[in-house]
Regions:
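Mixed-charge interfacial surface used for oligomerization/domain docking
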Residues: 1-23, 29-200
Length: 200
């Protein structure tokens, strides 16, 4: 896993188990993706009748969160063992920028691009693959808008007219794994409503 937080949360829950009911849900994501789940949990707590229903809603949202990054350098990916030394050396020689996704709580290499413009375009292509997006946030590691984020917002505005997607910072724990020069997207896909008319 990316972080030991799940195990720590379970131990903490056991310590106070006698005072209240606590259910630990593995977010299987990072950074803004976790913030999206918190908002889902708050809304579910207001709308649902039981703790079980709240947990069901949150676990359903876990399956609808997708996070991807590209990073300008591979040094941190080598140190965190996300990429092998041979791939890192070859990538540095070719000047490529790796794409990463968060899959089942792990950072996984997806593909590679050669230029920043290609990386931005690939992020946009990834976003437009979704037919209905409930929420999407651009991820960066700076308090002010980076040039990559500005480019990405402009491209997303073309593909999603009438919608604005803000940017947020990913924290030091993630920066220690992927570096401080990554740009990414956290996407919460809209929940698909089941149509009872299709029942046979």
């Amino acid at each position: 896993e990316i972080s030991p937080s799940r195990g720590m949360a379970r131990r903490a829950a056991q310590q106070v188990a006698g005072n209240c009911r606590i259910v630990v849900v593995d977010s299987e994501t990072v950074s803004v993706g976790q913030a999206m789940l918190v908002r889902v949990a708050v809304r579910a707590a207001q709308e649902q009748d039981t703790l079980e229903d709240v947990v069901r809603v949150v676990r359903g949202a876990v399956e609808r969160i997708y996070t991807v990054f590209y990073t300008e350098s591979m040094d941190y990916l080598l140190q965190s063992r996300i990429m092998s030394p041979s791939h890192t050396i070859l990538g540095a020689m070719l000047g490529i920028k790796p794409f990463l996704s968060v899959e089942n709580g792990r950072l996984q290499p997806m593909e590679k691009v050669r230029t920043r413009a290609q990386a931005i375009e690939r992020l946009v292509e990834y976003a437009v693959e979704f037919s209905d997006i409930e929420d999407m946030v651009i991820l960066q590691h700076k308090p002010f808008m980076s040039e990559q984020t500005r480019m990405l917002q402009e491209r997303l505005a073309v593909e999603f007219p009438g919608r604005h997607f803000p940017y947020g910072m990913y924290g030091p724990s993630l920066a220690a794994l992927i570096g401080a020069d990554a740009t990414g997207l956290a996407i919460l896909e809209s929940e698909i409503e089941k149509d009872d008319d299709d029942f046979f």
